[in-house]
């Protein structure tokens, strides 16, 4: 038996946006096969724009990236005619219509093969001025633009990324060149938009000491402002997730940025990047095990010194564990994010304690409705069902507890209900490995067990 204790009277701050993603709703308006309604219902708080150009439904080769919007670097940066905004306009409008806020990555999509947009700009300041106009288009209406109020603007992506063959898919210059480029761009943009959150650099690996040292030495020399620091991590265990977050905080603190907002804005289950391990990783991401890993990491992120977590990827691709890529129907991973969104609806995190490394949990309350999300995850492929004793305190009875399960047979479907009259009680549940469980506790208003309740999942 595994014990899980939850005290809804012990408040631990706001439920953080651990269920943010990369990219927005997908599908064909012509064919009417999109996932817009499901995407909207999931309640993703933010969508980061990265690798968006790889999907035609987002505008393809004409969308998001700086070199795709401003296609001739020698053109006049002040002339609206130098920009192609329309494909990105449509994409961002769809994200905003879904109720998801936009997190705009300024730079280029990853380039594993032919290199076009990942070369160092030949004029760093002009590149920053081009970005200024992109920001003004989407936030201030410039060039027949919009007023989206996009707060987060990230400079570049994974300058430190290296493939096994030694090639660099995201930055064709040196680490030092990138640091100089970033310094110019960040200082210029922050000077133009002091009210916005300007940050980066989306480290591929926070464990690369040479990259971090080259970058932060220039940042400190130039007193570069950071509204947030971003980094990426792919792993196959919750311990690796926890260790990576701790390493990032250690590195940032060592260079004097320990109190800066920290965002892990690419992550997913990856056991290996090549051959059979890569194929296994992709299969896992799209199944229940990948969904359990996502739920576990979101719960762990909530209790970590981390401000936002952004899953890669909601774009139709091999690493999308949220929607299938043929018909855009929800996969098991979708329900992990929808369940975490149910916690964010309540606003305030409540204390949880577990006795097992394989049990990850997070709880939330608004003072009347209480919800607990937990999953059993370990990096194995089979294990016995375990009894989980859920000890609950800090509620006012009588209450009805409803358990929603996501497993191989169910997708966030009601599993059982039980009424409790005491302020402290225990609920026993047979929990499968990789099962994801959301417990909702609501007051019973009148009529006892068959009376009305306030639940609405």
Protein language model features and the residues they cover:
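Substrate-binding cleft and catalytic face of glycoside hydrolase catalytic domains
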Residues: 42-236
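Carbohydrate-binding surface patches
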Residues: 355-397, 433-440, 447-448
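Mature N-terminal, pre-catalytic/accessory segment of carbohydrate-active enzymes
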Residues: 1-38, 42, 446-457
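Aromatic/acidic polysaccharide-binding cleft in carbohydrate-active enzymes
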Residues: 268-360
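Conserved, mostly hydrophobic/aromatic
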Residues: 21, 95, 134, 153, ...
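Glycoside hydrolase catalytic-domain groove-lining segments
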Residues: 230-278
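C-terminal beta-strand-rich structural cap/linker in extracellular carbohydrate-active enzymes
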Residues: 420-457
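Short, acidic/polar
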Residues: 27-39, 209-219, 291-298
């Amino acid at each position: 038996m595994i014990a899980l204790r939850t005290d809804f009277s012990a408040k631990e701050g706001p439920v953080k946006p651990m269920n943010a993603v990369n990219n927005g709703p997908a599908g064909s308006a012509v064919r009417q096969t999109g996932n817009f309604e499901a995407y909207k219902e999931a309640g993703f708080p933010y969508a980061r724009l990265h690798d968006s150009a790889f999907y035609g439904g987002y505008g393809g080769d004409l969308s998001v990236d700086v070199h795709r919007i401003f296609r001739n670097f020698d053109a006049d940066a002040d002339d609206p005619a130098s920009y192609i905004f329309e494909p990105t306009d449509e994409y961002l409008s769809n994200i905003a219509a879904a109720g998801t806020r936009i997190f705009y990555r300024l730079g280029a999509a990853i380039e594993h093969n032919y290199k076009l947009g990942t070369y160092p700009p030949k004029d760093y300041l002009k590149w920053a001025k081009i970005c200024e106009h992109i920001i003004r288009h989407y936030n201030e209406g410039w060039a027949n633009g919009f007023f989206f109020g996009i707060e987060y603007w990230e400079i570049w992506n994974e300058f430190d990324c290296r493939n096994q063959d030694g090639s660099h898919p995201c930055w064709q210059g040196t680490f030092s060149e990138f640091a100089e480029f970033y310094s110019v761009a960040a200082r210029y943009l922050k000077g133009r938009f002091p009210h916005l959150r300007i940050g980066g650099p989306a480290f591929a690996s926070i464990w690369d000491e040479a990259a971090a040292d080259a970058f932060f030495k220039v940042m400190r020399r130039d007193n570069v402002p950071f509204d947030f620091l971003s980094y990426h991590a792919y792993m196959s265990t919750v311990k690796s997730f926890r260790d990576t977050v701790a390493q990032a905080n250690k590195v940032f603190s060592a260079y004097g940025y320990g109190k800066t907002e920290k965002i892990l804005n690419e992550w997913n289950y990856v056991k290996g990047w090549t051959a059979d391990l890569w194929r296994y990783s992709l299969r896992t991401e799209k199944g229940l095990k990948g969904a359990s890993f996502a739920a576990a990491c979101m719960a762990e992120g909530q209790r970590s010194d981390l401000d936002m977590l952004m899953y890669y990827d909601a774009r139709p691709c091999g690493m999308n564990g949220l929607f299938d890529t043929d018909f855009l129907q929800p996969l098991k991973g979708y329900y992990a994010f929808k369940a975490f969104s149910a916690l964010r609806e309540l606003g305030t995190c409540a204390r949880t304690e577990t006795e097992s490394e394989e049990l990850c949990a997070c709880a939330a309350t608004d003072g009347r409705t209480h919800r607990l999300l937990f999953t059993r995850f370990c990096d194995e492929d089979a294990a016995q069902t375990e009894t989980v004793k859920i000890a609950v305190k800090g509620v006012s009875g009588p209450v009805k507890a409803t358990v929603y399960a996501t497993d191989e047979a169910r997708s966030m479907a009601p599993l059982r209900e039980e009424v409790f009259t005491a302020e402290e009680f225990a609920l026993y549940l047979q929990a499968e490995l990789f099962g994801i469980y959301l417990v909702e506790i609501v007051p019973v208003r009148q009529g006892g067990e068959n009376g009305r309740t306030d639940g609405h999942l």
